[in-house]
Amino acid sequence: MAKKVMALIKLQVEAGKANPSPPIGPALGQHGVNIMDFCKAFNARTANDAGSIIPVVITVYQDRSFTFITKTPPASMLLKRAAKISKGSGVPNRDKVGKVTHDQLVEIATLKMEDLNAADVDAAVSIIAGTARSMGIEVV
C-alpha cells in the first residue's frame, strides 16, 4: 500500500549549503521531518552544483518520512550568469543591463528543457528569451 502524502513543500536552497536555519528548518519542522536528514541528503546530492540556487520539492508522508526532487536552477539565475550581471533591470523596457547571444539561450534552454513546458528546444528558447527580455537583458 502506498504511503499517504501529508504535505508538499517547495523551497529554493543554495546547492550544498542546506542547514536547519530558516527557511528550511521552520518549513520542515512544522511537518515533523528530521531536518538534519534532509540537509545531509540535499547537500550530498547537490555538492557538484556549488553556487547555484536549486529549487527542491519535498514530499512529506504521514509517517514523517520524506522524498525530494531537485530541479534545474531558475532561468533568471542562469541568464544573469550568462550576461555577467548581478541583477535584472528595474525598468526592462527602458534600461538594458546586459546582452546574451542566441547560442547562450540555446544552451540554457537545453539545460532547462526537463523543467519547461515546451515540446522542443525552439519553444524552450523562446520561453528563455522572454524571461531575458523581462529582466532587461538584450538578446543578440
UniProtKB/Swiss-Prot annotation:
SMART domains found in the cross-reference section: RL11
Stored CDD domains: Ribosomal_L11
Entry superkingdom: Bacteria
Gene3D superfamilies in UniProt: Ribosomal protein L11, C-terminal domain, Ribosomal protein L11/L12, N-terminal domain
Keyword terms: Methylation, Ribonucleoprotein, Ribosomal protein, RNA-binding, rRNA-binding
SUPFAM superfamilies, per the entry: Ribosomal L11/L12e N-terminal domain, Ribosomal protein L11, C-terminal domain
InterPro entries: Ribosomal_uL11, Ribosomal_uL11_bac-typ, Ribosomal_uL11_C, Ribosomal_uL11_C_sf, Ribosomal_uL11_N, Ribosomal_uL11_N_sf
Post-translational modification: One or more lysine residues are methylated.
Coiled-coil intervals, chain numbering: none
One of the record's GO cellular component terms: cytosolic large ribosomal subunit
SUBUNIT field: Part of the ribosomal stalk of the 50S ribosomal subunit. Interacts with L10 and the large rRNA to form the base of the stalk. L10 forms an elongated spine to which L12 dimers bind in a sequential fashion forming a multimeric L10(L12)X complex.
Function noted in UniProt: Forms part of the ribosomal stalk which helps the ribosome interact with GTP-bound translation factors.
PANTHER family referenced in this protein's UniProt entry, alphabetically: 60S RIBOSOMAL PROTEIN L12, LARGE RIBOSOMAL SUBUNIT PROTEIN UL11M
HAMAP family per UniProt: Ribosomal_uL11 (MF_00736)
Record's protein name: Large ribosomal subunit protein uL11
Gene that encodes it: rplK
